[in-house]
A protein has these predicted regions:
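Intrinsically disordered, low-complexity segments enriched in Ser/Pro/Gly/Ala and basic residues
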Residues: 27-28, 37, 75, 98, ...
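Asp-based, Mg2+/Mn2+-dependent phosphohydrolase catalytic module
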Residues: 20, 66-70, 83, 87-186
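Gly/Ser/Thr-rich helix-start
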Residues: 3-5, 61, 77, 106, ...
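N-terminal helical cap/lid subdomain that shapes the substrate entry/recognition surface
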Residues: 1-63, 69-71, 82-84
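Conserved SAM-binding loop
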Residues: 1, 57, 75-78, 110, ...
């Protein structure tokens, strides 16, 4: 969703399509907390009902996951999405078994871009930063891993708050950029 469901609902109620939290903060709410709470509950219900409606894996993802599993490479999935949506989605896509560890946005005190999720994943897998790489499609992924001392690979597709991750190089710099996930296997 980009900045999370709460920000999406606030933008919808404020009729703001910019998605910029600082921009939103400049304007008083034109709705009260009760309206927001109700709208957010409706959003979550509909989202849960349609969780897999327009969701699929990018080309090459399944073959990369299978190849990494065949090499006994441990994987951790780190997402800012809440656990109640993440686990059913991974199961529906048939990829939950590839991950030794899944960290969701509501599991820890801080979400990406804070380094805590990456540091926790390293600890959970009993590896150090030098033994790991973060593959991500957003500035939050790259910033989180970089702050944790982990090398980064940025995929140039996916969702990065509506902008190309290659255009975000002023905000953060990945170690490597790839256009296809299968390039990880080369």
């Amino acid at each position: 969703v980009g900045n999370g469901a709460a920000a999406l609902v606030k933008r919808a109620l404020a009729d703001d399509d910019r998605g910029d939290e600082l921009h939103l903060a400049q304007y008083p709410n034109e709705y009260d907390d009760e309206i927001y709470t109700s709208a957010y509950a409706i959003f979550e219900r509909v989202y849960a009902e349609r969780l897999t409606a327009a969701t699929g894996l990018y080309d090459g993802v399944l073959s990369v996951l299978s190849a990494l599993a065949a090499e006994n490479i441990m994987l951790s999935l780190i997402t800012n999405k809440p656990r109640r949506f993440t686990v059913p989605l991974l199961q529906a896509l048939g990829i939950d078994h590839y991950f030794a560890d899944v960290l969701c946005g509501d599991d820890l005190e801080f979400k990406k871009p804070h380094p805590l999720p990456v540091l926790t994943a390293l600890d959970n897998l009993s590896v150090n930063a030098e033994q790991a790489i973060m593959v991500g499609d957003s500035i939050s992924d790259i910033k989180s891993a970089t702050a944790a001392g982990v090398k980064t690979v940025a995929v140039t597709y996916g969702y990065n708050h509506g902008m190309s991750i290659t255009d975000a190089r002023n905000d953060c710099q990945a170690d490597v950029y790839i256009d296809q996930i299968t390039q990880l296997l080369v």
